[in-house]
Amino acid sequence: MDINFSQNEARVIGCLLEKEVTTPDQYPLTLNALTTACNQKSNREPVMALDEATVLDTVELLKEKRLINDVSSFGSRVSKFQHRFCNTEFGSLKFTSQEFAAVCVMLLRGPQSAGEIRTRTNRLCTFSDVKEVEAMLDGLAEHAKGPYVVKLPRESGKRDCRYMHLFSGEVDVEALAAAVKSTSTAGLASANNERFAELEEDMKAMKLEIAELKELLESLTS
């Protein structure tokens, strides 16, 4: 895949995808509106604090890659921007509404479980259940022109695996799996060490109690 977004580029594209659906009356977005969207505290991970100059620099980079258009009318003093990332006449990347929503959320929030995607896309599309989300994600992972997403190793203490988009480069799943295993082993060792320390303290307390009982018995029998 030719696309390899930086963190700022992923945020800008994700915001344009989101606002195209959730606030169509305000789309395409002005620079001010796009900056506000990038810095939202809800549905963003991480929360960012980009200034307009940084957002504009990012927009210019995406324009060079032909992934954003300035659609302001002739003579207008305010620029307005729309994406050319997918589902447009300018490119071959086509997604269903569910695929569009899932990619949008992953661009804005990073790795997500199927359950999280179902919950966090409710303003963008509908899923009947988590299995439908998983089937859609598997389709993106096995897409003939992709893959567009990858299933990540399940983290220690987590019930579900998460999925990550591949529009910011390949993900080394084997390295992640090794890191997860190492973290899990380290966590277990740490827990064992803590338990051993607790047992040592219990033993010391018991020895002290026994010594006190001996002293009490000796005083009673003397």
Curated annotation (Swiss-Prot):
- In the UniProt record, the signal sequence range is none
Please list the coiled coil stretches: none
Record-linked InterPro entries: DUF480, WH-like_DNA-bd_sf, WH_DNA-bd_sf
Disulfide-bond pairs as recorded: none
SUPFAM superfamilies given in the database record: Winged helix' DNA-binding domain
Source domain of life is: Bacteria
Q: Which family does it belong to?
A: Belongs to the UPF0502 family.
Protein name stated in the entry: UPF0502 protein PBPRB0676
